Amino acid sequence: MSSAAVAASRRQSCYLCDLPRMPWAMIWDFTEPVCRGCVNYEGADRIEFVIETARQLKRAHGFQDGRPAGPGKQLPGKEIHASGDPGSRPPQPLDRYPLSSERPPRLGAEYQSARQANGIPVPNGFSKPDDPPELNRQSPNPRRTSGVPPNLVPLVNGSMAHAMNGRPGQMSDLGGNKRPASVSSTEHDKDKHRPDSLTPEISDGHKTRADDWLNKNKTVRELMTLNPYDGRFKKEHMQQRVMYETGPASKSDRGKHPKNLKRKASPEPDGEGTAGKINGDGQQWLPSASGDGLKMPPVPPPSFTSPPSTISPHPRTTPPEAGAAAAATQNGHSPIAALILAADNAGGNSSPKDANQVHSTTRRNSNSPLSPNQRRLAQGAGTPHVPGMDAVHPQSIPDSSVPSSIPLCCTLCHERLEDTHFVQCPSVPSHKFCFPCSRESIKQQGATGEVYCPSGEKCPLVGSNVPWAFMQGEIATILAGDVKVKKERDP
C-alpha cells in the first residue's frame, strides 16, 4: 500500500466543510467531528447550532438517497450503514450507526481504551487503526448522536415545524434519529413503527434531546451555557450601576440640579424618560429603584455643601480666592470660575508680574472684592497666608492689580503707568518708574558703571546693606526700548 493511500485512509472528513482532514486537525468534542478551521470560524459557542442546521439542511435537500462514494469523498451522513455484515440485511438510509452488540458505543473507560492502539495513543479520539479505511473516511462516530442543547430546542423545533410542513415522513425520521447511542435496537424498532403524526415525534425529540444533553461532554455543556449568561447579566450589571448613580434624585431634584446626572454609564441622553426607563417602567427584569437594596441617601442641595477639598492645593490654608469661589458658586455662578481660581492659586511658579496679572484679571471677572493691598493688610492682621502668592523676591512683586480707582503712577514724573510696562524697584514696593524716566536715570548715572535705583537712592537688598544695581542685560533692554519705539514710528 503506497504512502499516499495510507495518508488518504487516515484522513477524516469534516462534517461542515466536507474536506478531508488529518486526525490532529479534527475536534471530537461536539456531536459531529468537525475540523479546527470550522470551529474557529463559527465560534465554539455556536458550533452546535451550526452543526444542527447543517444536519437539517442535508436532510431537507435529499442527501439520504444512495449514492456511490468516491475514493477520497465523504459519503453524506445519512448514507452510513451498518458495518457488521453488508449482505445480512438491506441498507437502511436513516439507520446511521450499527446498534448490534458487536460494536458497543465507546463511552467512559472504553473510550479511553479506544484511544490506545497497540500502546500508541491515537490523537484526539481517532478511531482504531483496525477499522476499515472506508469507515475512517465516513465519520462513523457511534458515541456522538445528534442532540440540541435545551436553550436551542425551541428555536430548532420552531424552524423545523415550518421547514418540514407537509413532510410528515421526514419529520418522523428526524424524531427517530434523535435517539442517544445507548438506546437498544428494540426501542429503535418501536420508534420506526410509530404513526407519522407530527406532534408525538417532536415531543419524543424533546425527551431524547434532554437525555442526550445529560450525556454530552462537559466542555460542550459549559460552552453552550456561556452565551445567555453573559448577555443577560452584563446588561443587568450596567443598568444597576446607572441606577446607583441616578436613582436617588427625585423628580423635583432632577429639575433643580441636572448636574447630578452628568456622569452616567449609559449612552442614553439625560431626561425624565431615561430615569423612568431605568426605574423599571420599560424593563420588567430589572429591580425597581424604589427597592430597599438600591436606596441611597438624598444629595443635599449645593447651597449647603462646602467647597470640595480639591479646590485648593494647600489643605490647611483657606485662600481668599477659594472663599470668593465658594461665594460665587452659592450665588449661582458657574463653577468654572472656582476652578480657574484654584488653578491660579496653585500657579506660583510663573513670573511675579504674570502671576499678578492673571490674578487681577480673574478677580475682576469673578466679582471678588479683594485687591492685593487688602490681601497684604489681611495677612498682617492674622489671616492665613496664601502660599501660592509667594515669589522668589517678595519686594519685586509689582502692585499692578490695584483697582482702577487708584491708577499706577510713576514715582518721578507721576504719569500713569501701564499694567505691565514699567520698572519696579525690588526693595521698595512704592518705587515704580516709567521707561523714559528709567532711561534718563541710567544715562545720568552712566551706563558703564553701577546703576542704582532710578529714584536716586541706593535701596539695599533684602536682608543686607548692599544696594541693588541694574544688570547689564536689564540696562540694554531699557535703553533699547527707546530705539525700538523710534523704529516703529518711522514710515
Curated annotation (Swiss-Prot):
| Ranges of Polar residues composition bias in the record | 347-376
SS bond partners = none
Keyword list (alphabetical) reads: Metal-binding, Nucleus, Repressor, Transcription, Transcription regulation, Zinc, Zinc-finger
- GO cellular component: a single term: nucleus
Compositional bias (Low complexity) spans? 306-328
ZnF start-end (RING-type): 410-457
Q: In UniProt terms, what function does this protein have?
A: Acts as a transcriptional repressor.
UniProt lists the family membership as follows: Belongs to the IRF2BP family.
Protein name (record):
Interferon regulatory factor 2-binding protein 2-A
Q: Give the organism the record lists.
A: Danio rerio (Zebrafish)
